Each structure stands twice: as C-alpha cells, then as structure tokens.
Amino acid sequence: MEAHLDWYGVPGLQEASDACPRESCSSALPEAREGANVHFPPHPVPREHFSCAAPELVAGAQGLNASLMDGGALPRLMPTSSGVAGACAARRRQASPELLRCSRRRRSGATEASSSSAAVARRNERERNRVKLVNLGFQALRQHVPHGGANKKLSKVETLRSAVEYIRALQRLLAEHDAVRAALAGGLLTPATPPSDECAQPSASPASASLSCASTSPSPDRLGCSEPTSPRSAYSSEESSCEGELSPMEQELLDFSSWLGGY
C-alpha cells in the first residue's frame, strides 16, 4: 500500500501532482464514474495533455511508464503511426487480388444482368408479335365463315368451330355435285333408241332413201333419221333444271366449285 501511495517508487511524482491544479490536469485523465477503476492508456501521455507543464510531473510520468513496462503491469506500446500505416498498406497489398476478384465478379454479375434483361426484352417482343399475328389471322377467318361478320364477335374457339363446320359443308356439297355430274355423264353416254329399219337398211339410191325417211318421220321430234341433238345442249338443259332446285347458298357454293374446276 505504501508502494502504491509512493507512485511506484518514482521520486518527486507525488509532489509534482500535488502542485498541479486539479482543474487543469483532469483533462488528461479519462472520466471514471463512482466505483470504477481508472486505467492508464496503453501509449505515452503526450505533453500537450498537461496544461500545468510541470517538468517534475512530466519526468515522473515518463519514469512511471518505463517502470510499469519493465514490470509487465501494462501492455506493450502500440507501434508508431508510420509502422501502423506500413502494416495497413501491406495488408491492403496482400488483399488486393481478392479485391480484384470481387470487383471482377461484381462487373461480370452486372454484365450478366444486363444481357439477361436484353434477352428477356427480345423474348417479350417476339411474343407480342406472335400474338398480334394470331389475332390478325382470326380476324381474317371471321370474315369468311358464316355469321362471322355479325355484330357479335366470335371467340377464337367459336371461330374455329364455325370454320370446321363450314369446310365440312363445302366438302359434302362438292361430293354431291360430283355425284350429280357423274350421273349426268353416265346418262348421256348410254346408247339411244335404235333407228328404224327403213333408215338403217341401205337403199338403191340416196334420193330414194331420203324420201323414204322423210315420209316415215311425220315430225322432227321423232327419233328417225333426224339429226341427234348435241350432248352439250342436253347436259346444259339438265344442269339448268338441277340448278333451279338448289338453294341460294348451294348455288353460290356450286359457282365456287365451278370456279375451282376451271383451275
């Protein structure tokens, strides 16, 4: 206890501390609350912290610092500012490759993000163009299917269903038209009523044969030696009679099929 009161055996330190005013020297010591221990800083106390500037106090503080360091009561002094700066610079130089790798990784991540955003923008643009073309195709299809140009707008499913039904109706109509045409062609190719014996047998002279044919055929409507009608006229008359029985829609489809047959 006596050694502690004697300031670790440093002569003149107690007298110098008593001679220094308390108000001026209080700024050099850290603030301590009641019941707390006061610890000295781990580095020498600069001269500027002491406003009293007593030579004895300064010398006593230096001796106290040296004695405490030798006794191991306080930790070793920190390196000087130049040493600290050199160590920090060496640490920065050692960590510089990692910093470079991190910066490269950061730049590569930013580049990948920009490229991915550009790819997403191009994909969205292609999708918008595709949807636009699909809508234009359905709009053109609605104008060709029955009841497609009505005030009520058909949905895509209804438009496709109407188009399928319309195509099937056209196929049935074309099949019926082909059957009628085949039947008409078969009727025209069958042999007609054979001519009379008088016209079939050869006579002595052409003049007598013509007179006998003229006498036996009272009217030109009979099938004698009269000149037969052309197959085209008979086909056109029968086709006109068949066309008269068709509905307007069937007539339109028939005209469409005849137009397709021309190609």
Swiss-Prot record:
Cellular compartments annotated: Nucleus
Cited Gene3D superfamilies: Helix-loop-helix DNA-binding domain
Consequence of gene loss (knockout): Embryonic lethality between 9.5 and 10.5 days post coitum (dpc). Abnormalities in extraembryonic trophoblast cell types; by 8.5 dpc, the ectoplacental cone (EPC) lacks diploid precursors and by 9.5-10.5 dpc, the spongiotrophoblast layer of the placenta is missing and the labyrinthine layer lacks normal highly vascularized organization. Unexpectedly, does not exacerbate trophoblast phenotype at 8.5 dpc when combined with simultaneous knockout of basic helix-loop-helix transcription factor HAND1.
Protein name: Achaete-scute homolog 2
Biased composition (Low complexity): 110-121, 202-220, 230-247
Region (Disordered): 104-126, 194-248
PROSITE patterns: BHLH
GO molecular function: bHLH transcription factor binding; DNA-binding transcription activator activity, RNA polymerase II-specific; DNA-binding transcription repressor activity, RNA polymerase II-specific; E-box binding; protein dimerization activity; RNA polymerase II transcription regulatory region sequence-specific DNA binding; sequence-specific DNA binding
Native source species: Mus musculus (Mouse)
SMART domains, alphabetized: HLH (SM00353)
